[in-house]
Amino acid sequence: MTTRLADIAAQAGVSEATVSRVLNGKPGVAATTRQSVLAALDVLGYERPVRLRQRSEGLVGLITPELENPIFPALAQVIGQALTRQGYTPVLATQTPGGSTEDELTEMLVDRGVAGIIYVSGLHADTTADMQRYERLRAQGVPFVLVDGFSSQVQAPFISPDDRAAMSLAVTHLVSLGHTRIGLALGPKRFVPVQRKIEGFVRTVQDQLGLSAETVEKELVQHSLYTLEGGQAAASALIGRDCTAVVCASDMMALGAIRAARQLGLDVPKDVSVVGFDDSPLIAFTDPPLTTVRKPVPAMGQAAVRTLLEEIGGTPAPHSEFVFMPELVVRGSTASAPGERGRP
């Protein structure tokens, strides 16, 4: 056995003690090192112990908000598939109203011995939350990556879409169609993605329509909930202020905006244009098919996994924010402004 350990150690470039830990399934070995030892076994023609055949590299926690918004299951699927390809087993922990909190889910995952955690739209996106919870987690030696949100108080990799650019794409599209009264429906202001969307929206409306920032924020921005009902309420208010187009911070809100327009006897897109955000699964098949700003979910999910595995493997990525560009997808819910039709 000693000769065998020495051969494997030499082939893998690690100590015999490390080889022993891998063969006996002991913790405390980096994923990349474990893979090197298993590869050495294969190269030297040794048969892998039964427990190491198709063995998971470990558990990785994924904490998401409620799954009613279809963008979260889509992102969870991308992350789960990427983890599985790397030999890890994803453990999905979902927050629900009245259910477990993020802190409780984190504690549960740590107790289960996860190798790391990916947070999606968690408390790191809430400017009123205590960010010390993440520093305490880091002190426990648990690597983590934060998706959709940012805080300079947390030393960790962040993965985000460019929310400001998303609003610029949406507003520019609507202005090109002749709309001059464009509203924005989005969630509570304490969330970082909301603040960034407002910044991008206000700046683009200022630049392209010449309105003051004060006027835009006071008359054209409506906060609500990230739900269909929330979008309906916000859009009703904006249409009541003579908006002929509404940009929504999620596709679910956009579906609510379409419902609001119809309940007011208006047609989408003939009377009111609606733009969503996310490009959730099946959103192309709504009536009308929704024009939306596509969140780069595959790229973000894969980057989150890659970054976390670098943290787990001991070669951490920079503790900064990786920002991914969104894409405008034009479908059937936007059209020329009512007053622009028929003009040469």
From Swiss-Prot:
Disulfide bonds: none annotated. Residues 5-24 bind DNA. Keywords: DNA-binding, Repressor, Transcription, Transcription regulation. It holds the Pfam family LacI. Signal peptide: none annotated. GO terms for molecular function: DNA-binding transcription factor activity; transcription cis-regulatory region binding. PROSITE patterns: HTH_LACI_1, HTH_LACI_2. The keyword Transcription applies. It comes from the Bacteria. The keyword Transcription regulation applies. One of its GO terms (biological process) is regulation of DNA-templated transcription. Residues 1-54 form the HTH lacI-type domain. InterPro entries: HTH_LacI, LacI/GalR-like_sensor, Lambda_DNA-bd_dom_sf, Peripla_BP_I. Transcriptional repressor of the maltosaccharide utilization operon malEFG. This is HTH-type transcriptional regulator MalR. It comes from Streptomyces coelicolor (strain ATCC BAA-471 / A3(2) / M145). The lineage of its organism: Bacteria, Bacillati, Actinomycetota, Actinomycetes, Kitasatosporales.
